[in-house]
């Protein structure tokens, strides 16, 4: 029985990156051998075991054979006769198909039959064998790795293979859970725009997210968007979200906030009147199709509907500011307002020449919320009761008190309006 470190741990160590998790493959063993040594079986689809002390995963060497279309169409075989090279051959990229002995101290302890170390040095993402085409999820993984390893390029032959897979309909069989899983992970990488560049290049974006794909080539008003192209703007917004270390909820909202611009009638371009509501409708369809988590879809919905109003909030008076806060549910969920405003800031700064501009709308709306929060609703309700009011009338009094609090703040501070963002959205 031989044990080897494999996958991302070897790759990242060779790149000089931090290694947080280790994956191990075991050659020449049976499940009974592993159990006899105290390993805990946890694998459902193939034999995977937890180390009795470190709790790291140890998988028996295995081969995979295509038996149908899509992600689940595989027959897995494990046997003590499966070699290390056979196990590595089923992996997606050469940089992930390097193994090292458990006592790894130098290059002599590496087993690299597919040239992964060479591709690491050359900064190339290259598929291991033609069996890459058997799993369409690998298209998404390559795109995600491009967003992580920002100085790597996809090998021409690998890009061609991915194009063939899309053309042959393999991407049509991606299951929603895996699409969302890879999309979410890719959005959290250092340069998420590169994921979408790769997906566009191979044709997969039109399959998994046609609502995003159609944004390229759609013009915007150059006085507000010097980059003009909506797809280019979207990628700049995503990379700004990564630069500001935004959480997944914000990054997904950034991805989907302008979907409606892809359905703007041609005769009104480059204006996009009403695109916010169209974006919200398209967002709903995307979330249902990909089974997007509730917290992501809820934030994205508010951002899609309200980002234009937030950009123009410098023109709003007290009553309109309070209504905006109410539509954002900011009074009940002030922490979520921070994420809404962060997404809007990414949108405003994700334009050519705007990356270093301030976004004063954020401070203005937060200050308006603070004024609203200064109203003690219980006191207002008690006063309403003294006046013999109840039901909706109490709510109206609370709303009026909040508007007055914001009006007083605006008057006391003589707040100047932020620079108009126009159609920054």
Swiss-Prot record:
Monomer. Can also form homodimers and oligomers. Comprises two domains: an N-terminal domain containing the nucleotidyltransferase activity and a C-terminal HD domain associated with both phosphodiesterase and phosphatase activities. GO terms for molecular function: ATP binding; CCA tRNA nucleotidyltransferase activity; cyclic-nucleotide phosphodiesterase activity; magnesium ion binding; phosphatase activity; tRNA binding. CTP binds at residues 8, 11, 91, 141, 144. Residues 230-331 form the HD domain. NCBIfam families: PRK10885.1. A single active site specifically recognizes both ATP and CTP and is responsible for their addition. Mg(2+) binds at residues 21, 23. Its EC number is 2.7.7.72, 3.1.3.-, 3.1.4.-. It catalyses: a tRNA precursor + 2 CTP + ATP = a tRNA with a 3' CCA end + 3 diphosphate; a tRNA with a 3' CCA end + 2 CTP + ATP = a tRNA with a 3' CCACCA end + 3 diphosphate. It comes from the Bacteria. Belongs to the tRNA nucleotidyltransferase/poly(A) polymerase family. Bacterial CCA-adding enzyme type 1 subfamily. Keywords: ATP-binding, Hydrolase, Magnesium, Metal-binding, Multifunctional enzyme, Nickel, Nucleotide-binding, Nucleotidyltransferase, RNA repair, RNA-binding, Transferase, tRNA processing. Magnesium is required for nucleotidyltransferase activity. Transmembrane segments: none annotated. This is Multifunctional CCA protein. Its cofactor is Mg(2+); Ni(2+). ATP binds at residues 8, 11, 91, 141, 144. Pfam families: HD (PF01966), PolyA_pol (PF01743), PolyA_pol_RNAbd (PF12627). SUPFAM superfamilies: Nucleotidyltransferase, Poly A polymerase C-terminal region-like. It comes from Acidovorax sp. (strain JS42).
């Amino acid at each position: 029985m031989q044990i080897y470190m494999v996958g991302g741990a070897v790759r990242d160590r060779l790149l000089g990156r931090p290694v947080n998790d280790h994956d191990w493959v075991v050659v020449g063993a049976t499940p009974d051998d592993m159990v006899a040594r105290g390993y805990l079986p946890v694998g459902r689809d193939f034999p995977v075991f937890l180390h009795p002390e470190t709790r790291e995963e140890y998988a028996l060497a295995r081969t995979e054979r295509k038996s149908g279309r899509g992600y689940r169409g595989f027959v897995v075989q494990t046997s003590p006769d499966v070699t290390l090279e056979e196990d590595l051959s089923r992996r997606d990229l050469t940089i992930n198909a390097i193994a090292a002995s458990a006592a790894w101290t130098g290059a002599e302890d590496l087993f690299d039959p597919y040239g992964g170390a060479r591709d690491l040095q050359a900064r190339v993402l290259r598929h291991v064998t033609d069996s890459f085409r058997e799993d369409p999820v690998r298209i998404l993984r390559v795109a995600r790795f491009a967003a992580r390893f920002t100085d790597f390029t996809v090998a021409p032959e690998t890009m061609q293979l991915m194009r063939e897979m899309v053309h042959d309909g393999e991407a049509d069989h991606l299951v929603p859970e895996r699409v969302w899983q890879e999309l979410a992970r890719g959005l959290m990488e250092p340069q998420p725009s590169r994921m979408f560049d790769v997906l566009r290049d191979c044709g997969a974006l039109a399959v998994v997210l046609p609502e995003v794909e159609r944004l390229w080539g759609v013009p915007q008003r150059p006085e507000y968007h010097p980059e003009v192209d909506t797809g280019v703007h979207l990628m700049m917004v995503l990379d700004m979200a990564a630069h500001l270390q935004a959480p997944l909820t914000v990054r997904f909202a950034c991805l989907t906030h302008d979907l409606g611009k892809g359905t703007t009638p041609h005769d009104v371009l480059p204006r996009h009147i009403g695109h916010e509501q169209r974006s919200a409708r398209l967002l709903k369809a995307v979330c249902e199709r990909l089974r997007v988590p509730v917290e992501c879809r809820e934030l994205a919905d508010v951002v899609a509907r309200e980002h234009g109003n937030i950009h123009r909030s410098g023109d709003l008076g007290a009553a309109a500011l309070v209504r905006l806060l109410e539509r954002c549910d900011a009074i009940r969920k002030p922490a979520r307002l921070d994420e809404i405003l962060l997404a809007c800031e990414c949108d405003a700064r994700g334009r050519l020449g705007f990356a270093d501009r301030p976004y004063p709308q954020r401070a203005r709306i937060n200050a308006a919320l603070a004024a609203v929060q200064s109203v003690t609703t219980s006191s207002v309700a008690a006063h309403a009761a003294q006046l013999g009011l109840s039901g909706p009338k109490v709510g109206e009094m609370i709303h009026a008190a909040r508007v007055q609090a914001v009006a007083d703040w605006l008057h006391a501070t003589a707040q100047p309006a932020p620079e108009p963002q126009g159609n920054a959205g």
